[in-house]
Amino acid sequence: MHQRLTLKLHQRSKTMKITSALKTCVSVLVVSGITIATAQAVTPEDKGLEIAKEIDRRDLGFGDSRTELQMLLTNRHGDKSVRKLRLATLENQDTDAGDKSLTVFSHPRDIKGTAFLSFTKILDPDDQWLYLPALKRVKRISSANKSGPFVGSEFAYEDLVSFEVGKYDYKWLRDEPCGELDCFVVERFPKYENSGYTRQTVWVDKSEYRIRKIDFYDRKESLLKTLNQSGFEQYLEQYWRPLKMVMKNHQTGKATELAFSPYEFRLGVNENAFTPNRLKRLK
């Protein structure tokens, strides 16, 4: 009798321990499941922002660069005209502002010496100046005119600033093939004032986070332009640059193609060259 009672108590104690252990395991699994679910519950906005941050991170530290390029303008009738120019870019170490760029035209004769200087900001208006030799004066580009065409091309002034994460809100839309690559498709919405665009749809390749294509939508939500970038080359084993950019205006039928010569990096570009007062002396 005593042995039976002892055995029953032992079995009951063992059963309680097993039950307690099972409850603990279930609790751990439930908590783990919540943690995993929380980690996986990334919103499209969060994912879009992370993609933008990775694009930016991969281009940090280039210092300065220089290249020459040809601009080919095509009107709606297929008539073409060619311009030649050079471009210098200076990376800004200030996280509150973007890069500085200087563009100088060398051909044809009627626009030779025309120079464009741009200081990219985040949400404040970008500082931009245009020197026109015929007028012999430096003109500051009004923030209200950032959507205007740059020297008759299909690129707007706001297209000619460096990419800065803080200029936009983001939303990941989907993943899809883009040519032979796989791409993220991300929508971005300008946060800065006076943009000519309500939104932009951006195709970013997954392998190197290079922007391959951008669709621009105007203030009426109509597709305005498409930019295609191709012929990417890598420099300093890190920095990718497209050697061909084509901006097609769907509403006018016009197009502008930029064909770049190979880039040169870390030449020790003098920051003093990036000042409005120097524009008149450039050739």
Question: What function would you assign to each model-found segment?
Answer:
Residues E91-A97, L173-D182, Y235-E237:
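Short, ordered beta-strand-loop transition motifs
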Residues L282-K283:
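Short, solvent-exposed mixed-charge patches
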Residues S106, L117-F119, D127-Y131, R137-I141, ...:
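Gly/Pro-enriched, hydrophobic low-complexity segments
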Residues L5, K14-V26:
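Bacterial N-terminal signal peptides that target proteins for export
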Residues V31-Q40:
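C-terminal segment of classical bacterial N-terminal signal peptides
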Residues P44-A134:
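N-terminal mature ectodomain segment of secretory-pathway/periplasmic proteins
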Residues E164-Y168, D175:
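Surface-exposed beta-loop interaction hotspot
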